[in-house]
Amino acid sequence: MLQEPSAAFSLRRNSFRRRSPRSNVDDRGWNPLHIKARKGDLKSVKQLLDQGMDVNALAWGPKSKGVSALHLAAEGGHIEVMDLLLERGANIDAKTWGSCGWTPLHAAAKERKREAVKFLVENGAFLADDITDTRFNPPVHYCHGLEWAYEEMKKLNSESSSSSGGDTSSSSDN
């Protein structure tokens, strides 16, 4: 009698393995790419992308409405994984669904992953002061760590403008 459940489990496990990795999702709606990106497993993320997983696939679970692998890598502060995902075409400004509309930059800021925020801003992530959600609340309303992201972005912008500004006297010449 113990052999029947064991055999049934073995059959289910083997049939699960035969399915395409694109169809495997957990109770959060995460596929293997989401899971490996959140863990920061660069080798596995590369393998999954090489096997054809969609770099912009979104998770659809009770608490994962539109979360991408880039959101999860940013949340974990996994720079190398984020770099690979962007290299493969991940949307740097992908927004989650629902009232928040968080981008990967929001996710990194919420977890106070300074290097991830810096990396995203340097790679073109957009975070305007006037972004609002469907309730007209700015992201800072939902994420107490976001004030820091705005400060980091301003700091990076001022550093880049001061390094590229060089000679400003040409406009004041008479």
Swiss-Prot record:
Keywords: ANK repeat, Cytoplasm, Mitochondrion, Nucleus, Phosphoprotein, Repeat. The modification Phosphoserine is found at residue 15. Mostly expressed in flowers, cotyledons, leaves and siliques, and, to a lower extent, in roots and stems. Also detected at low levels in seedlings grown in continuous dark or light conditions. Expressed in male and female gametophytes. Changing residue 16 to P: Abolished phosphorylation by PHYA. Impaired repression of PHYA-mediated PIF3 phosphorylation. Normal interaction with PHYA, but decreased interaction with PIF3. InterPro entries: Ankyrin_rpt, Ankyrin_rpt-contain_sf. Changing residue 10 to A: Normal phosphorylation by PHYA, normal repression of PHYA-mediated PIF3 phosphorylation, and normal interaction with PHYA. Changing residue 13 to P: Abolished phosphorylation by PHYA. Impaired repression of PHYA-mediated PIF3 phosphorylation. Normal interaction with PHYA, but decreased interaction with PIF3. Disruption phenotype: Embryonic lethality in homozygous mutant. In heterozygous plants, impaired male-female gamete recognition when pollen of ank6 mutant is placed on ank6 female gamete. Defects in female gametophyte development at the one-nucleate stage. Abnormal hypocotyls length. Reduced accumulation of anthocyanin in seedlings grown under far-red light, in response to high light and after sucrose treatment, associated with lower levels of the UDP-flavonoid-3'-glucosyl-transferase (A3G2XYLT/UF3GT), a major enzyme in the anthocyanin biosynthesis processes. GO terms for biological process: double fertilization forming a zygote and endosperm; embryo sac development; male-female gamete recognition during double fertilization forming a zygote and endosperm; negative regulation of protein phosphorylation; positive regulation of anthocyanin biosynthetic process; response to far red light; response to high light intensity; response to sucrose. Residues 1-13 have a biased composition (Low complexity). Changing residue 15 to A: Impaired phosphorylation by PHYA. Normal repression of PHYA-mediated PIF3 phosphorylation, and normal interaction with PHYA. Residues 1-29 are annotated as: Disordered. PROSITE patterns: ANK_REP_REGION (PS50297), ANK_REPEAT (PS50088). ANK repeats lie at residues 28-57, 65-94, 100-129. Phosphorylated by PHYA. Interacts with phytochrome A (PHYA), both in Pr and Pfr forms. Binds to PIF3, a repressor of photomorphogenesis in response to phytochrome-mediated light signaling; this interaction may trigger the repression of PHYA-mediated PIF3 phosphorylation. Interacts with SIGE/SIG5 in mitochondrion. Interacts with RPS9M (via C terminus). This is Phytochrome-interacting ankyrin-repeat protein 2. The gene is PIA2.
